[in-house]
Amino acid sequence: MNTSIMRGFAHARTACAAFIAFFLLLMVCSLPANAIEIQEVVSPKGIHAWLVEDSSVPLVSMRFSFKGGTSQDPAGKEGLANLMTGLFDEGAGDLDSDSFQEQIDNLGAEMSFSASGDSVSGNIRMLAENRDAVTGLLALAVNNPRFDQDAIDRIRQQVVASIEASQRNPSTIASRKFGEVLYGNHPYGRPDEGTVKSLQTISRDDLLNFHRTNFARDRLTIGVVGSIDAKELGEMLDRVFGDLPAMAELVPVPDAKLALGTTTSLSFDMPQTSISFVYPAVPRKDPEFFAAYLMNHILGGGFTSRLYAEVREKRGLAYSVSSAMVLRDHVSALMISTATRPEKAQESLKIIREQVAAMANDGPTEAELAAAKSYLKGSYAVNNLTSSVSIADTLVGLQEAELPRDYIDKRGELIDAVTLDQVKTIAKKLLQAEPAILIYGPAQS
């Protein structure tokens, strides 16, 4: 299991990197958080996108996402979506792999694709003057990927080599095993990249069918930032996505049920013992989300958190300890993670459990809540709005969470509205559950 909302194979070709990086730096400086104006653009063919215009630098960044992802991989063909993302720039339309990538390079563009459990996503950055040519190539990749057999075999072997290398990594082995335990037979319990065995079963027809059933306009979310206006963007959207099917043919995915109360223990010859706790959380759209968000920050979300103070600062048990809310389409979880010396593993477990129990029973103080509100309001721009790429990513994330365009402006008010009693209530609701635990390291721990 991977704790990040986005995991997969990202195959990117970057050219003129220093040139683009220079303009990206200028764009960062030109987009203060309080000046971001989000427009909703609807193309002539009805494709929706959110746009932040910035003509101060001649760049355009776009992120797009198709709902589905690796959860749509058929049983026995795990890794299909991930493999597909590695093939989009390996030839499209009349262009073979070399020709396609040469044109991307010559245009100074960056194009990448990735797959997670919930979506297949793409990113593109380009000079505004090359926009038509670059998006013409993107249109070929999105609509008419070639999936040539030689490219399939080559990219498949790269993924296989990566899997085989990761099978020597205790962290990866433990993460995959924990995912199987935590999610059971749910698609989230499968590795996004598949297995060596499952990858061998994937054919060109499988790739073509997955592309046909998953890439459709009704599952598409788009965020664009840079030197482009609404009219130009509408034309670009239709050029790239307008010929896709109107409706996807996705297999329904049930909500996942966390296997709480389980302990997964694995022995490895390694210098430290790693520990993870998983508790339930609430979805992004839940009315109690901000109360849970604040509670998590106070518990383990930063250098001033209770876990950091008790585990690292007071006792020196670990270099780092943290908690985070992991929000996916079909499950929400709160994960606590740390690594410690083997002889201190049981003490670390004990201290973490004590801090969780204290939060569940008594909640935070008024002072802790006030500090958390101040930090989380002030850090949003730094974490989400520091570059054209991060802004485009944020635009997609807000739409996928079904949040309004004025969310960034209203977010501070939503945080301030949370009361101490609400945080205490959600802490008791979530943290009194018996967690799922992963512990791996030397046998003596």
Where in this protein do the model-derived segments appear?
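N-terminal secretory signal peptides that target proteins for export/translocation
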Residues: 1-13
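Bacterial N-terminal signal peptides
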Residues: 17-30
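His/Glu-rich zincin catalytic helix
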Residues: 31-103, 123-126, 136-137, 208-310, ...
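M16 family metallopeptidases and their MPP-like homologs
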Residues: 52, 57-85, 97-143, 172-197, ...
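Short, polar/flexible loop-turn hinges at active-site or ligand-entry regions and domain interfaces
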Residues: 91-94, 143-150
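Short, glycine/charge-rich beta-strand/loop segments that flank catalytic centers
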Residues: 117-124, 150-161
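Short, conserved secondary-structure transition motifs
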Residues: 159-166, 256-266, 374-383
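Acidic/histidine-enriched active-site and ligand-binding environments that engage anionic O-linkages
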Residues: 207, 423
